[in-house]
């Protein structure tokens, strides 16, 4: 668990209908306040039914699901080779990057608990779902086997004096 920093993963995505790889974070207080009140930072979501497209999202009590804090980005070569997916998370803003290119910034003026639950510790999750409400429901079984290849995951934080 940690609060604030630069978080990145260098990964090669699996491709095909029904696949749903993700690199994301949840508020460490999820057991106390439940989702979405704990906050969620989706650094990367890819769904095989939408080629060349990635999603970055923030989920809060005020904004969860496919809302204003979900950014859908077309990247022509996202299915080839390795790519760097990262987020810069500070007390003021959350910035999302793909291959060091800024694709979305969330910097609300009003930081109530409903809008900004991002001032507490979070933890990382990386997973590959098959099907599901976002990745499916149809799965093309002919695509298997597939791999979600992770080169590295890094978290950088400023030192406190």
Please place each PLM-identified region on the residue numbering:
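GH16 jelly-roll
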Residues: 1-161
């Amino acid at each position: 668990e940690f609060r604030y920093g630069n978080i990145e993963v260098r990964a090669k995505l699996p491709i095909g209908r029904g696949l749903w790889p993700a690199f994301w974070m949840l508020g460490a207080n999820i057991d106390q306040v439940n989702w979405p009140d704990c906050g969620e930072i989706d650094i990367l979501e890819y769904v095989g039914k939408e080629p060349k497209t990635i999603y970055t999202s923030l989920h809060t009590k005020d904004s969860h699901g496919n809302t204003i804090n979900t950014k859908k980005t077309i990247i022509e070569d996202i299915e080839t080779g390795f790519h760097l997916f990262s987020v810069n998370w500070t007390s003021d803003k959350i910035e999302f990057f793909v291959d060091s290119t800024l694709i979305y910034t969330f910097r609300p003026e009003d930081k109530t608990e409903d809008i900004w639950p991002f001032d507490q510790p979070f933890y990382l999750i990386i997973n590959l779902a098959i099907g599901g409400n976002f990745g499916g429901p149809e799965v093309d079984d002919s695509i298997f086997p597939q791999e979600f290849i992770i080169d590295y995951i890094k978290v950088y934080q400023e030192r406190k004096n």
